[in-house]
Amino acid sequence: MYKRQAFNSRFFKADSCTYGTGSQTSNALPLYLGLTGNNKQGVLNSLVADIKAHGTRLTTGDVGNRYLFQTLAQNGLNDLLYSMLNHYETPGYGFQLLHGATTLTEQWDPNQGSSLNHFMMGQIDEWLFKTLAGIQNRPGTYGLRHLLIKPTLVGDLKYVNASTESLYGIISVSCTRSSLTVDIPVGSDATIVLPDGTEKQVGSGKHTFNF
């Protein structure tokens, strides 16, 4: 509590409801770390306003990307995050694809001569797997043994397919606007959250749900 108070006393600006320089990283970090207290909604509003003021584009880099992406995701702003990422301009992943990148590049603009095989901007991976595909640990658990599967289709996405390997085997998710198929490895179990909020408890094996 004392450290949070000291942090807010030093960096929070009540007149603008922002932190530090007011940049996207400056506001996303304390939001993600739970330092904003009663000012959470105001700081979140300031963050969203800054994103929109930049044409729905990010201004973060290697340090701030993860906190921006996860702050938006954890506050239900996945459609905004999708709009920030689903384009072919710089800064953005589409610009790298447009210029022939087959691996992540060190700079948003791959033509700047830096490394062409660099995980510098790879923090989006967490959002793809944990939010879009919805592959998560059940709260209070670790190691992807007790799973929470909660896919989120945003924007104009028609489907999402993903798989990842845990200590227990391959976990796979295939979700469309009308169905969800999951494959849970032996030794694991999962809570499945359907789009209407209905929860299903399943063990290992392949399970399909229509909605």
Regions found by a protein language model. Name each.
Residues M1-Q5:
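Conserved small/polar residues in nucleotide/adenosyl-binding loops
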Residues A6-A14, G92-F95:
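Secretory-pathway/luminal and periplasmic proteins that interact with or process carbohydrate-rich
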Residues S9-N27, L47-N65, N111-M120:
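Solvent-exposed loop and edge beta-strand segments that line ligand/cofactor-binding
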Residues L29-N38, Y67-N75, K130-I135:
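Well-ordered alpha-helical scaffold segments within catalytic/enzyme domains
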Residues K40-V48:
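Alpha-helical repeat scaffolds
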Residues A53-G92, H99:
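Repeat-solenoid scaffold signature
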Residues Y82-F211:
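Non-catalytic C-terminal accessory modules of carbohydrate-active enzymes
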